[in-house]
């Protein structure tokens, strides 16, 4: 008997077949660099920076920016942002810089140039006759890179959220050490004309390069990061959520995974912790792998590890976390089952902690405490099974365990308890639910059961 086949009749004829469905066609690519070559892009001929500044500023004022010219200018302007490397900087075996080296964002990557000239048109007319200062260059670079952040803000953020962000960014780039070079609201007007620029590979690459540089190098113009910070751990929401989750429940990654009682976690956990990826290395290329073009399909996104993502945010919802209530449910990754497990884990970690004395008046008190704890452990080991369960908890110190949670789930037939449902409904009904959010899912799924 083939376990994958089903048998049925059609017009009295027995049919045996294997049901096959559409599978995920994406091939996840890991970002590890194996050829010891820095990330690389190719741009047009390097421009005269003064001419390029005037052209790009003119285009910004007219809300008509040429993406090729903008990228060429941003790459050339890297020379203005020289800083000192604080430590030897290596990633994936590549030596980026030695301690004390003077470096610019260009030191992190390779930018190849062709002989093709840019347009460098004066779309908005000629306003600046003198050559720009370094602070004016820095302001223009900051405003241009902020277009990346604005284009990453999703439509789910309602009201004037994006406009308010643009206003705050403009304020940064019109105060020292920057200088005002555009009129108010120019940034938002320009953004509307290039709202999808985060999808342009070269622009995204340059945003990631600037962010990687300013995240490590102390610099007068480090505030430029306000527009590029979204490139850090981009398309890593699954891994980022897991990291936040283990900090929230105060467990190690290994301890937390022991609570993941579902077969669909197996492939995702293997995918998320593929060896050799520098996930835990500070200032690695890994942090900006998406923008630097090291992976076309991230294995760390919410879609790539959807069951893990769903579980984490159902636990977050149980604990009343706004971030989890607002997050988008991965509908194809068993949200109903994940909500059940999330309820039990939420109950396990909500309003409960493991505590012990760690600070003492003097060394004598510390030694007395340690001796008392040792005695308590010896008593627990010699336990003959006659103490009641409350004392057993006290002596063993075992207030949390995957085995206990798993047993409770099995005893309840894999269903949520009424107390879980009441908690879910309580946190979700008091929240302004966004479309397809966890709050909306919980409200629609469990509100009638409460």
From Swiss-Prot:
Subcellular location as annotated: Virion; Host cytoplasm
Alphabetically ordered keywords of this record: Capsid protein, Helical capsid protein, Host cytoplasm, Phosphoprotein, Ribonucleoprotein, RNA-binding, Superantigen, Viral nucleoprotein, Virion
UniProt PTM comment: Phosphorylated by host CK2. Unphosphorylated protein N seems to have a better affinity for leader viral promoter encapsidation. Phosphorylation of protein N in ribonucleocapsid may stabilize the interaction with protein P, thereby playing an important role in viral transcription/replication.
Extra remark: Displays a superantigen activity in human and mouse, activating mostly V-beta-8 subtypes of T-cell receptor.
SUPFAM superfamilies: Rhabdovirus nucleoprotein-like
Cystine bridges: none
Effect on the protein upon substituting residue 377 to S: In strain: CVS-1991 and CVS-2006
Family: Belongs to the lyssavirus nucleocapsid protein family.
CC per GO annotation: helical viral capsid; host cell cytoplasm; ribonucleoprotein complex; viral nucleocapsid
Residues modified as Phosphoserine: 389
Role: Encapsidates the genome in a ratio of one protein N per nine ribonucleotides, protecting it from nucleases. If expressed without protein P it binds non-specifically RNA and therefore can bind it's own mRNA. Interaction with protein P abolishes any non-specific RNA binding, and prevents phosphorylation. The soluble N-P complex encapsidates specifically the genomic RNA, with protein N protecting the genome like a pearl necklace. The encapsidated genomic RNA is termed the nucleocapsid (NC) and serves as template for viral transcription and replication.
GO MF annotation list: RNA binding
Name of the protein: Nucleoprotein
Assembly information from the UniProt record: Homomultimerizes to form the nucleocapsid. Binds to viral genomic RNA. In nucleocapsid, binds protein P and thereby positions the polymerase on the template. Protein P acts as a chaperone on free protein N to prevent it from aggregation before encapsidating genomic RNA.
Pfam families attached to this UniProt entry: Rhabdo_ncap
Organism of provenance: Rabies virus (strain CVS-11) (RABV)
């Amino acid at each position: 008997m083939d376990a994958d086949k089903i048998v049925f009749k059609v017009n009295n004829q027995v049919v045996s077949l294997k049901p096959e469905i559409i599978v995920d066609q994406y091939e996840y690519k890991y970002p590890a660099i194996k050829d010891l070559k820095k990330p690389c892009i190719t741009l047009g001929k390097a421009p005269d920076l003064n001419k390029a500044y005037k052209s790009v500023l003119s285009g910004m004022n007219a809300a008509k920016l040429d993406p090729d010219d903008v990228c060429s200018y941003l790459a050339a302007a890297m020379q203005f942002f020289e800083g000192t490397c604080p430590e030897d900087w290596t990633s994936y075996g590549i030596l980026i810089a030695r301690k004390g080296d003077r470096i610019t964002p260009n030191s992190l990557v390779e930018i190849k140039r062709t002989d093709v000239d840019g347009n460098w048109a004066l779309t908005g007319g000629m306003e600046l006759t003198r050559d720009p200062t370094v602070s004016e260059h820095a302001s223009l670079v900051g405003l241009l890179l902020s277009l990346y952040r604005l284009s990453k803000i999703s439509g789910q953020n309602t009201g004037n959220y994006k406009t308010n962000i643009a206003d705050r960014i403009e304020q940064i780039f019109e105060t020292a050490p920057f200088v005002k070079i555009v009129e108010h609201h120019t940034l938002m007007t320009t953004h509307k004309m290039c709202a999808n620029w985060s999808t342009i590979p070269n622009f995204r690459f340059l945003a990631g390069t600037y962010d990687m540089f300013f995240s490590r190098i102390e610099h007068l113009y480090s505030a430029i990061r306000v527009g590029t910070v979204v490139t850090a751990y981009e398309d890593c929401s699954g891994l980022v959520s897991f990291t936040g989750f283990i900090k929230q429940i105060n467990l190690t990654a290994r301890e937390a995974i022991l609570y993941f009682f579902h077969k669909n976690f197996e492939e995702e956990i293997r995918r998320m912790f593929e060896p050799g990826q520098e996930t835990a290395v500070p200032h690695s290329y890994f942090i900006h792998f998406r923008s630097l073009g090291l992976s076309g399909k991230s294995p760390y996104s919410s879609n790539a590890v959807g069951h893990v993502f769903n579980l984490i945010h159902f636990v977050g919802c149980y604990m009343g976390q706004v971030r989890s209530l607002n997050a988008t449910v991965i509908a194809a990754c068993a949200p109903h089952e994940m909500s059940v497990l999330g309820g039990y884990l939420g109950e396990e970690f909500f309003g409960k902690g493991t505590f012990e004395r760690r600070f003492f008046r003097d060394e004598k008190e510390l030694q007395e405490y340690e001796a008392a704890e040792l005695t308590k452990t010896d008593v627990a080991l010699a336990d003959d099974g006659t103490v009641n369960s409350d004392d057993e908890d006290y002596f063993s110190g075992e207030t949390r365990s995957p085995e206990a949670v798993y047993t409770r789930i099995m005893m309840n037939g894999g269903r949520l308890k009424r107390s879980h449902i009441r908690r879910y409904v309580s946190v979700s009904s008091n929240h302004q639910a966004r479309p397809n959010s966890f709050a909306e899912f919980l409200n629609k799924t469990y509100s009638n059961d409460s």
